[in-house]
């Protein structure tokens, strides 16, 4: 079974598929033992059990009965993780190999339990809308939100908060008149203050029950308030607060988010809910100010942040981090949708999405298809008509005594529960084996790292076991448990270990570690760490003779890894010069969300060539791939770009494709568009689509991604072989040459 087939079954992909047998050997592998785990990975034939799972009796283990358990005819089972003997349920007595319960079936290494405990409340959605925007963009946003109401479950609860200079909490329970409560936009209200202001006795018709907590009137079932909500949305207008010349609009996004998180916490703490922020510009009021209201005050840049010259940055980060921590505690999620050319402060707000599993969508305006389609795709449904999102989840990682959990990197938060299987060596968010997943979807993928605890030699083919238990609130109103159990061999044989290396998963895992380090360390230090790691890995696993460059050889399991690292070093994830702080935060957020294949596309984009005399084919991400008679399709995950070579572009401008005798040219021009459309179908967020040609202004998006093997200062390579890239970046060939020299010289 290859790595991708195993991923399709269990949603797990390891850097090393065989583990070193001792702690000392594990310390020499350079790339840590890690897995990319997608808890809700879609699987057509997923086994489903309509009852509660059976747990190991060992309180330090509590693993779930699984196919790797040994079943005793006497009516007990032995836990493979801790070795505890546990009794089988009475109705399992007398089971045979031909009559196994579903959870013991070998095909049930991943299984979903639908537990008997129902969820007492439906999912909650709270819109937080910025009204400081032009009429056309506000109208487009309102139209999209009204369309989306039909996609929510009918019993879902919904609420509305709007903000400009002030914050308005709308009372959807008021049918006769539109009623809202106004809060100052320059104050941070705590839960008690909000409760005192909003939780007032409500006059009701005689005989009608009255809520003990009247705050519930701000979050009501869509099926009951769709008309009132639609009416309020249709009549929303631009914030009336005057904006003087030379000023930015007064926006109270920080206060609005604080009120929203407190309102959900006071009403539905511990039940799945999403706060959805629609921002058309930066917060210009404290709390949470991103930039001051005067236009003469510039927005912070990467350089300002590095030099500690961004005067609002640390205070804003601290404020939004506090909201994120409170939201995680309550089990809620925050999504951020930006619809403007300006920065809204995604960098400062990143913890709101990062810790709660929320999404970030970055678009130029709410009128764009990037926003509209991305937002509506959030409400995609499964075959049974339920939303493809889980709420208020937890991830519990169990492992056998040979292993310990080092940490997790992804959109989750630590539950700070320490167990015996937690390693002292932390990678990412460590110190625990249990994490909060406020939101989890079939796309959410987590990098989980392990440490070998074993110190003495093991017998050949000794097995280790890892179990991932994901508990979450399903959109159908049930609590579910997705259990994935995997087994890996422990070996002291370096050749066996080498053969088990998955260089694609390893590259993605190392990219996540790199981004995690980038949040804390200087950018140059992070790049040096990446380089040292690559040199050490090659020194350990490459074949070479000391001081002889030409003898350097990497086996097929490692041959692509340096290439991935080269493109990672050049990517927008680490090279922030041409991106705003918000763009960098957005790109990094998405990389931390996606699975192995999508992450690799972000690190090393794919390039497909179309020509008249051959079938479409993948080509090198290299400047030599640009030809006058070719069309190239570039997929960076964030952009889908069609590039027409010089000759093709001239033919297209001349309109040859419209002439009957040039039907083959017309077909050639359509082929990349059809393939691009297929790429756009399921992707979230929706990528930006670019159609350009040789000499076009947007061709820079392609050139910036290409390996510059033909540049202005490399005259010998220029000619018929590709296009000239105007850059001082080193090419992959030069990078590999330097790598070989450093490896064979023994340098670190």
From Swiss-Prot:
<protein>
    <recommendedName>
        <fullName>Protein transport protein SEC23</fullName>
    </recommendedName>
</protein>
<dbReference type="GO" id="GO:0005789">
    <property type="term" value="C:endoplasmic reticulum membrane"/>
</dbReference>
<dbReference type="InterPro" id="IPR037364">
    <property type="entry name" value="Sec23"/>
</dbReference>
<dbReference type="Pfam" id="PF04815">
    <property type="entry name" value="Sec23_helical"/>
</dbReference>
<dbReference type="InterPro" id="IPR006900">
    <property type="entry name" value="Sec23/24_helical_dom"/>
</dbReference>
<keyword id="KW-0813">Transport</keyword>
<dbReference type="InterPro" id="IPR036175">
    <property type="entry name" value="Sec23/24_helical_dom_sf"/>
</dbReference>
<dbReference type="InterPro" id="IPR007123">
    <property type="entry name" value="Gelsolin-like_dom"/>
</dbReference>
<dbReference type="InterPro" id="IPR012990">
    <property type="entry name" value="Sec23_24_beta_S"/>
</dbReference>
<dbReference type="Pfam" id="PF04811">
    <property type="entry name" value="Sec23_trunk"/>
</dbReference>
<keyword id="KW-0333">Golgi apparatus</keyword>
<dbReference type="Pfam" id="PF04810">
    <property type="entry name" value="zf-Sec23_Sec24"/>
</dbReference>
<feature type="binding site">
    <location>
        <position position="61"/>
    </location>
    <ligand>
        <name>Zn(2+)</name>
    </ligand>
</feature>
<dbReference type="Pfam" id="PF08033">
    <property type="entry name" value="Sec23_BS"/>
</dbReference>
<dbReference type="GO" id="GO:0008270">
    <property type="term" value="F:zinc ion binding"/>
</dbReference>
<feature type="binding site">
    <location>
        <position position="56"/>
    </location>
    <ligand>
        <name>Zn(2+)</name>
    </ligand>
</feature>
<feature type="binding site">
    <location>
        <position position="79"/>
    </location>
    <ligand>
        <name>Zn(2+)</name>
    </ligand>
</feature>
<dbReference type="InterPro" id="IPR029006">
    <property type="entry name" value="ADF-H/Gelsolin-like_dom_sf"/>
</dbReference>
<comment type="subunit">
    <text>The COPII coat is composed of at least 5 proteins: the SEC23/24 complex, the SEC13/31 complex, and the protein SAR1.</text>
</comment>
<dbReference type="GO" id="GO:0070971">
    <property type="term" value="C:endoplasmic reticulum exit site"/>
</dbReference>
<dbReference type="InterPro" id="IPR036180">
    <property type="entry name" value="Gelsolin-like_dom_sf"/>
</dbReference>
<dbReference type="GO" id="GO:0030127">
    <property type="term" value="C:COPII vesicle coat"/>
</dbReference>
<comment type="function">
    <text>Component of the coat protein complex II (COPII) which promotes the formation of transport vesicles from the endoplasmic reticulum (ER). The coat has two main functions, the physical deformation of the endoplasmic reticulum membrane into vesicles and the selection of cargo molecules.</text>
</comment>
<keyword id="KW-0963">Cytoplasm</keyword>
<keyword id="KW-0931">ER-Golgi transport</keyword>
<keyword id="KW-0968">Cytoplasmic vesicle</keyword>
<dbReference type="Pfam" id="PF00626">
    <property type="entry name" value="Gelsolin"/>
</dbReference>
<dbReference type="InterPro" id="IPR006896">
    <property type="entry name" value="Sec23/24_trunk_dom"/>
</dbReference>
<keyword id="KW-0256">Endoplasmic reticulum</keyword>
<dbReference type="GO" id="GO:0090110">
    <property type="term" value="P:COPII-coated vesicle cargo loading"/>
</dbReference>
<dbReference type="GO" id="GO:0005096">
    <property type="term" value="F:GTPase activator activity"/>
</dbReference>
<keyword id="KW-0653">Protein transport</keyword>
<comment type="similarity">
    <text>Belongs to the SEC23/SEC24 family. SEC23 subfamily.</text>
</comment>
<keyword id="KW-0479">Metal-binding</keyword>
<feature type="binding site">
    <location>
        <position position="82"/>
    </location>
    <ligand>
        <name>Zn(2+)</name>
    </ligand>
</feature>
<keyword id="KW-0472">Membrane</keyword>
<dbReference type="GO" id="GO:0006886">
    <property type="term" value="P:intracellular protein transport"/>
</dbReference>
<dbReference type="InterPro" id="IPR006895">
    <property type="entry name" value="Znf_Sec23_Sec24"/>
</dbReference>
<dbReference type="InterPro" id="IPR036465">
    <property type="entry name" value="vWFA_dom_sf"/>
</dbReference>
<dbReference type="GO" id="GO:0000139">
    <property type="term" value="C:Golgi membrane"/>
</dbReference>
<keyword id="KW-0862">Zinc</keyword>
<dbReference type="InterPro" id="IPR036174">
    <property type="entry name" value="Znf_Sec23_Sec24_sf"/>
</dbReference>
């Amino acid at each position: 079974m290859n790595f991708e087939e195993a991923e399709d079954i269990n949603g797990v992909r390891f850097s090393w598929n065989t583990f070193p047998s001792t702690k000392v050997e594990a310390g020499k592998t350079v790339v840590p033992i890690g897995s990319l785990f997608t808890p809700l990975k879609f699987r057509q034939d997923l086994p489903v059990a309509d009852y509660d799972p059976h747990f190991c009796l060992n309180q330090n283990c509590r693993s779930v009965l699984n196919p790797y358990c040994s079943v005793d005819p006497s009516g007990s089972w032995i836990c493979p993780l801790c070795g505890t003997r546990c009794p089988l349920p009475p109705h399992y007595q007398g089971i045979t190999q031909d009559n196994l319960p579903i959870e013991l079936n070998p095909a049930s290494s991943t299984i979903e339990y639908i537990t008997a405990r129902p969820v007492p409340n439906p999912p909650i959605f709270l819109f937080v809308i910025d009204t400081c925007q032009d009429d056309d963009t506000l109208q487009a946003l309102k139209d999209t939100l009204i369309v989306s109401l039909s996609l929510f479950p009918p019993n879902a609860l919904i609420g509305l908060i709007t903000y400009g200079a002030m914050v308005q909490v709308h009372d959807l329970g008021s049918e006769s008149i539109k009623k809202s409560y106004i809060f100052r936009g320059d104050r941070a209200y705590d839960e008690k203050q909000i409760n005192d202001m909003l939780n007032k006795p409500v006059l009701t018709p005689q005989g009608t029950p009255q809520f003990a907590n009247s705050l519930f009137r701000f979050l009501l079932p869509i099926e009951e308030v769709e008309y009132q909500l639609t009416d309020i949305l249709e009549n929303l207008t631009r914030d009336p607060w005057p904006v003087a010349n030379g000023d930015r609009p007064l926006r109270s996004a920080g206060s609005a988010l604080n009120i929203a998180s407190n309102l959900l916490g006071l009403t539905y703490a511990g039940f799945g809910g999403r706060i959805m922020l629609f921002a058309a510009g930066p917060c210009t009021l404290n709390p949470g100010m991103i930039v001051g209201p005067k236009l003469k005050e510039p927005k912070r840049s990467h350089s300002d942040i590095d030099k500690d010259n961004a005067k609002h940055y640390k205070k804003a980060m601290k404020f939004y981090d506090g909201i994120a921590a409170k939201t995680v505690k309550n089990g809620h999620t925050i999504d951020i949708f930006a619809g403007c050319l300006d920065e809204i402060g995604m960098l400062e707000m990143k913890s709101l999405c990062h810790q709660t599993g929320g999404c970030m969508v970055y678009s130029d305006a709410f009128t764009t298809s990037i926003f509209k389609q991305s937002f509506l795709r959030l409400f995609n449904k499964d075959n049974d008509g339920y939303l493809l999102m889980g709420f208020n989840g937890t991830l519990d990682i169990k492992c056998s005594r040979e292993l310990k959990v080092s940490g997790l990197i992804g959109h989750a938060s630590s539950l700070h529960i320490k167990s015996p299987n937690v390693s002292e060596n932390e990678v990412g968010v460590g110190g625990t084996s249990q994490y909060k997943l406020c939101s989890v979807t079939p796309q959410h993928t987590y990098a989980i790292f392990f440490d070998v605890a074993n110190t003495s030699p093991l017998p050949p083919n000794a097995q280790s076991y890892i179990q991932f238990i994901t508990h979450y609130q399903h959109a159908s109103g049930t609590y579910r448990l997705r259990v994935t159990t995997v087994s890996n061999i422990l070996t002291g044989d370096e050749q066996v270990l080498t053969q088990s290396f998955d260089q694609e998963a390893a590259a993605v895992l190392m990219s996540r570690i790199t981004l995690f380090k980038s949040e804390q360390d200087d950018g140059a230090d992070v790049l040096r760490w990446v380089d040292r790691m690559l040199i050490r890995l090659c020194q350990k696993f490459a074949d070479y003779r000391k001081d002889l460059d030409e003898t350097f050889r990497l086996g097929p399991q490692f041959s692509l890894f340096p290439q991935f690292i080269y493109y990672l070093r050049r990517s927008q994830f680490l090279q922030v010069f041409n991106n705003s702080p918000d763009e960098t935060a957005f790109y990094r957020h998405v990389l931390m969300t996606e699975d192995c294949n999508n992450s690799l596309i972000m690190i090393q984009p794919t390039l497909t060539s179309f020509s008249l005399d051959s079938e479409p084919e993948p080509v090198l991400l290299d400047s030599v791939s640009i030809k006058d008679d070719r069309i190239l399709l570039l997929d960076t995950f964030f952009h889908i770009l069609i590039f027409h070579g010089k000759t093709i572009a001239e033919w297209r401008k001349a309109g040859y494709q419209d002439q009957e005798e040039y039907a083959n040219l017309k077909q050639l021009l359509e082929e990349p568009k059809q393939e691009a459309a297929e790429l756009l179908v399921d992707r979230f967020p929706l990528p930006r689509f670019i159609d350009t040609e040789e000499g076009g202004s947007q061709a820079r998006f392609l050139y910036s991604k290409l390996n510059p093997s033909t540049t202005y200062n490399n005259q010998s390579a220029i000619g018929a072989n590709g296009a000239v890239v105007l850059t001082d970046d080193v090419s992959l060939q030069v990078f590999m040459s330097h790598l070989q020299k450093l490896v064979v010289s023994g340098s670190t």
